[in-house]
Amino acid sequence: MKTGLVLEGGAMKGVYTAGVLDFFLDAGIDFAKCYGVSAGACCLCSYLSRQKGRQYSVFTDYLEDKNYWGLSSLLRTGDYFNVQMCYHDIPERLNPFDYETFDKNPSKGYAVVTNIETGLAEYLPMKNMHRNIDAVRASASMPLVSRPVEINGKLYLDGGLADSIPLLHAVTDGCRKNVVVMTKETGYRRVQPKHLELIKARYAKYPKVYELMVNRAAAYNQQLDYLEAEVKNGTAFLIQPSRPNEVGRIEKNRKKLRAL
């Protein structure tokens, strides 16, 4: 029976996921298939390359670096997180990514993305990070603060828009047992997002994005109900923070990140 790994997003809250995956590396825990959403896809890279501590360093080493993120990058490039630094300078030079180990890992990794034209989630293979880095970037491209990413003629944004917790996909993909890592605390339920009119205006050419945002809270909470049922059935094991934390999606406080 195949066991899958499902990683929720959460932007800088993903530092929690990085810590969980470091524990898995220490314990020698592997999974047949792994599904990463947004920051979860980023964390999945360092897990599959078996580089303990690397993703935590990526989250925390560049907090004061204006080349890493910020309004200047957003205004200059359309991306709050600087694409050149995040997806090229860091893995290729500043904090080298082990491409060879990643490529040899028998586990299959998938970056969850949202097709902004169809409004559907897609699960892009992460087979080779030299070729598939844009799949990870697309998965982590948050609305309003990121440009859509074009891959093979299709435009994508953050996978969390269409499938925040892809447990059902993991099950239908053959993983009857799954470990789910969430960045939201026990008891969390999503509420209707703010800035819906801004979303509607920004993505006027892609109305599916607005539809997804309008329905996101209800869809997310339905996924939580399904997850809870799978946990009760013994077919899913859930790891998440036990209590609320002060870490924001764009968090620059190193102490808060370390505490999480």
Q: Can you name each region flagged by the protein language model?
A:
Residues M1-V37, C45-L260:
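Patatin-like phospholipase
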